[in-house]
Amino acid sequence: MALCGVCSTPNLPNLQVFRSVRNSSIGYKRNHSLWQLRSSSFRAKSVIFHCSSSLRQSPSNVEEIDDNPSVSLEDESAHVMQFKWSDFRILDRVSIGHGGRADELVFEAIVQVPDSPLFNQGVVLRKLNTTRAQRRGRRAIEVFKKLVRRRLLYHSYSMQVHGYITNNLSDDQYSFTLVHGCHGSFSIRHWLQQSDWIPTLEATLALDEESFRRVGDDTTGGPAVSRQLRLIRTLMRDILIGVNYLHSHGLAHTELRLENVHISPVDRHIKVGILGNAADFNGDVPSTSNAYSTMDRRQMMIAFDMRCVGFMMAKMVLQELMDPLIFAKLKSFLAKGNDPSSLREFFVTTLNTNSESGNTGVQILDRNWGAGWHLLSLLIATRPSERISCLDALKHPFLCGPRWRVAPSMDIIRWGLGSTAVKISEEYIYRMPQRQRLAHFIGLMEMLNPYPKPNCWLELLPGRWRLLYSTGKHIGLTLRQPSTRALIGNVHLTITRASESINNTSLSFTSDIRFTAITSKDWPHNKIGAAGKLQTLSQFRLIAGKRLYLKEEKKNIGKFSMGEPDAEEGLAEKLETEKWKKVVPFKEFPSSLPVAKLVSGEIEVTMNMNDHIDSPGSVIGEVRKQIPPEMFDLSKLVCGTYIDSRLLVLRCVNGSALLFTRSSLDHKSM
C-alpha cells in the first residue's frame, strides 16, 4: 500500500521554529492565529526559520533557508494528505486490534474520493480529543515526513500515516483526526490469544519453504514446538528490522508493545505501530552537553526499545505471561535486582510445567543449548549498556535457523556448556554415561572461566545458589532400607558479603537443606511427614590461588565405582581437537589454572523440625548420607573454579565439584 498522490496541500498548524535560551535545540511552537493557511500562499513563499537566543549566534544561525529540494518542507509535506469527513464512508464496526486510548475515538472507514490513490481502501480514523493526544498525532506526521524518504522500508515495517482531516468552522478547532492505514484486524497480542493461532498465523503470513529459508530453516510442518519456533523467528526478525530502521534514522519508538504491533496480510510484514511517541536521539539536548552525554542519551533510548522487544519476545514464547498477574511477577523479579540470566530458574518454578510434554515455551528457549534464554537475558539486561542491539540480535543463534552458520562468541559457548550441564542434571538419571558427560562439561566450563580474579568473585558470589549436581558419591534410597526415611527438598547455599569495602574479603556461607522426615515403615504415596531444615553457617576468606593438574597415571576404576573415570584425560583429548583449539585461550592442556581459594573458619550447625520425632539423630544421619558431605561440613569447600551471573562451580577437598545455579526462590520454599 504505497502513497501515490496528494489530495491537497496540508493544512497543519503553522509551526514557528524558535531557539530557547536554556535549550539550544530547535523546538516547535504552534501559532493559533495562523491555524488556517491557504495552500497558494504556502507554496509561493520560501520557508524561513527565525531563530532567537540571548546567546550570540553566528549569522548563519540567525536565518536559515533550506535550498535543498530533496529535503525541503514543501516536498516532505507533499506526502501528507488532507481529507474531509465527507471523503469517507464510516463503517459500523471497529476491529479489536485497533482499540484506542481513553482520549481517542477510533473509526474504520472506506475512502470514497475517486481521484484519491486510496480509493475504496480501508483506513483507520483516530479522533484525538486532548492536547496530549493531538501532540501524538502531529508527532506521527512529523516522523512520517522524516522517514518517507526511504519509502520501501517505511511502508514495509511501519504503520502508514496517510494524513489528517481538516476541521470545518462548526467543528472543534482544537480536535485533530489522524488517518492511517488498516493493517489487518488483529494486533499480535490478539493473534496469540486465538486458540488456533499457529495454523491461522501461518496461513496469514503464507509461510512456505521459501519463507522459512529466509530465517535459515528448510523444513515445514513438524511438531508444535518446531512450528512455533519458526513463527517466532519470522516475527522477531521482522520486528527487529523495523526497530533497527527507526534507530538508524535517529528515532526511538518508546511504545513497543504487542498491542501496537500489527501484521499486514497484504505484504506479510510486521508494522511497528503509529510513531506518535517516537523520540529523537538528539532532541532537547542541553546546550552544555557534550558528545558523550548525547551518545549516552542515544544508548539509553535504544536500550529502552530493546527491553520492550525483550518483553514482546517473552510473551510470544511464554504465553503464560499474557496473564497480567504472572507478568507482574516477572516485573517484580527484575525490579528486585535479580539478574535476567537466571530467568529460566524463575520461569520453571513459576509456570506450570507439570504437563506430560512440559511447557512449550520453555522447550523452545531450551533448544540450541539454551540460546533463547541467552537472547532473552540480553534483551532485558539490568544495565542498559549490556543490552543487545538490533543488528547483533539478528545474528544471534536463536533467530538463525540450522542452515545458517553462525560463529558463536565465547559468551555463547560458555552459555551452551552451562545450559547442557543443567539439562543433564535435571534428567536425574545419573548412570555412568551421564556422570561422565557432566564431569566433562564442568571441566570445560572451568577451562573457560570468564572471571578468574578474586575481585570479580567478590562481586558475583553474593546471592542465593541452588545445588544442581555433585560429581562425588550419590547414595539414594533404592538399595537401602533405613529406619527413618528423609525426602530431600531444595538445597541452597546463601553467600553474603560482610562489607562492601574492596579490602574486605570476608564472606558468610549458609547451607540451607530442607527435607521431610518420614517415620512410617513403608513409603506413603502422599509423602507426608515432618518438615525440617538443616543449616550450616561458616565464615570464609577469599584469596587468589591456583588449581594444579597433576600428570600421573590413572588407576583402573571398577565398573560399579561412583568416581570420575579419566575426566581430566578425556578433557585433554577434547581440547586437542581442531574445533576447541580455536576457542580455548591456550594451545595445550595447562598444568594449573587460577581459582578463588576459600579459607574457612568455624562452623555452626542447627536443625529445626516442625513436628516432634523420636530419633532426630537418625534423621540427621540419613540427610547427611543423601546430600554431598561438603554441604554439611562447609570447611571441605576449598576453591571456586567457575562463576558467572548464572552458574557456580566449587571444588572440594576430595576433588569433587558442586554445580550451583543462581536462585531467586523464597527462603520458605521447599
Swiss-Prot record:
Q: Where is the Protein kinase domain?
A: 88-399
Q: Name one GO molecular function term.
A: ATP binding
Q: Which domain of life is it from?
A: Eukaryota
Keywords for this protein? Chloroplast, Plastid, Transit peptide
GO biological process assignments: response to osmotic stress
Q: Where is the transit peptide?
A: 1-52
Q: What induces it?
A: Up-regulated by salicylic acid and down-regulated by jasmonic acid.
Recount the PTM note. Not autophosphorylated.
What's the main place this protein lives? plastid
- Where does it reside? Plastid, Chloroplast
Q: Which family does it belong to?
A: Belongs to the PAP/fibrillin family.
Please describe what this protein does. Answer: Directly regulated by DOF3.6/OBP3; unknown function.
Entry protein name: Probable plastid-lipid-associated protein 14, chloroplastic
| Organism the protein comes from | Arabidopsis thaliana (Mouse-ear cress)
